């Protein structure tokens, strides 16, 4: 289902800066105040901690996050690009519906995402959840 909400011009270029240049550790996207487009809200520095990522998730508002998730597996340092659809239970129902119906347009435009995670509360966006999903692939 598509909501008709467009992507701001810098959404994909900012993603490519993360994917190709490792310029960022994460990108936080949101729907603009006028509900017309998905915009880059902020970025996380390259090498940011997992705690920095979780602190950027608002308690009552939906966000999309692309995270360059760093982890160790069998002693080797690895990373995967994860897409997080953050839609907390406490968010406004209309905004949750809008965020859910708009997610695919951003997700499909960001070519190279390896893992997708949906979160409605803090228990679904723990480091252990990411690690489990990333090591299954």
Curated annotation (Swiss-Prot):
GO terms for cellular component: actin cytoskeleton; cytoplasm; intranuclear rod; nuclear matrix; nucleus; phagocytic vesicle; ruffle. Keywords: Actin-binding, Cytoplasm, Cytoskeleton, Nucleus. PROSITE patterns: ADF_H. One of its GO terms (molecular function) is actin filament binding. Disulfide bonds: none annotated. Belongs to the actin-binding proteins ADF family. PANTHER family: COFILIN-RELATED. This is Cofilin-1A. It comes from Dictyostelium discoideum.
């Amino acid at each position: 289902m598509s909501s008709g909400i467009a992507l701001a011009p810098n959404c994909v270029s900012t993603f490519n800066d993360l994917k190709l240049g490792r310029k960022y550790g994460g990108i936080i996207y949101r729907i603009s105040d006028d509900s017309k487009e998905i915009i880059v809200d902020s970025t996380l520095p390259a090498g940011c901690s997992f705690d920095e990522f979780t602190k950027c998730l608002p308690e009552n508002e939906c966000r999309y996050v692309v995270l360059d998730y760093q982890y160790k597996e069998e002693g080797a340092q690895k990373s995967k690009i994860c897409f997080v659809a953050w839609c907390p239970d406490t968010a406004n129902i209309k905004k949750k519906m809008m965020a859910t119906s708009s997610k695919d347009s951003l997700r499909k435009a960001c070519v190279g995402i390896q893992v997708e995670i949906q979160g409605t509360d803090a228990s679904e966006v723990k480091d252990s959840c990411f690690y489990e999903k990333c090591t299954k692939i």
